[in-house]
């Protein structure tokens, strides 16, 4: 996984995995706050109260997330092709045009592809691409991938986010968990390969940590 993370960093774009959110201002603390941050990829998001007037500030970004989204969609297409090929394979076997070994091989490849798809989807749907904090400091917006490899935004009240200082995760680890007191979905942040754009807001969300020293 570390080698894959190092490889995908080479494919970072100038504006990676960012997009307008239907009237929601989004700006990264180091860029022009009046500039829309956007992309053409489909997006799914939960409804946020006062979304039309709320302003969010980016404080963390993992540039390689767009590449992982592409890999996720590629894996989904590859799995679909292997599964779709099974019925014709069984038919050809029934007609004596394929051997049993060939059909077993096709079934094995399809099963392996489905297993890998489930594993990749489970991990990638929890890998954080961008973190935002609203201006009032009460809402954390987590941009991550959905099952189809497109961006999805999840909103977490700050009161529900467990600071890193209260967890057993170490900053030297490849992935650090974003956990919630409510026990809802856990996300993963890679501090080794991601970038903290605003340390003040990062500390506000996750607490003072030795990685910021």
Curated annotation (Swiss-Prot):
Residue numbers on the Mitochondrial intermembrane membrane side: 101-102
InterPro entries: Tmem186, TMEM70/TMEM186/TMEM223
Segments passing through the bilayer: 80-100, 103-123
This protein's UniProt keywords: Membrane, Mitochondrion, Mitochondrion inner membrane, Transmembrane, Transmembrane helix
Transmembrane as UniProt keyword: yes
GO biological process: mitochondrial respiratory chain complex I assembly
Single GO cellular component term: mitochondrion
UniProt cross-references to Pfam families, sorted A to Z: TMEM70
Its membrane topology: Multi-pass membrane protein
Highest taxon in the source lineage: Eukaryota
Residues in compartment: Mitochondrial matrix: 1-79, 124-213
Localization per record: Mitochondrion inner membrane
Main localization (coarse): mitochondrion
UniProt keyword Endoplasmic reticulum present: no
Subunit (UniProt): Part of the mitochondrial complex I assembly/MCIA complex that comprises at least the core subunits TMEM126B, NDUFAF1, ECSIT and ACAD9 and complement subunits such as COA1 and TMEM186. Interacts with MT-ND3.
Functional description taken from the UniProt entry: As part of the MCIA complex, required for efficient assembly of the mitochondrial complex I.
Family indicated by similarity: Belongs to the TMEM186 family.
Protein name: Transmembrane protein 186
Organism for this UniProt entry: Homo sapiens
Name of the encoding gene: TMEM186
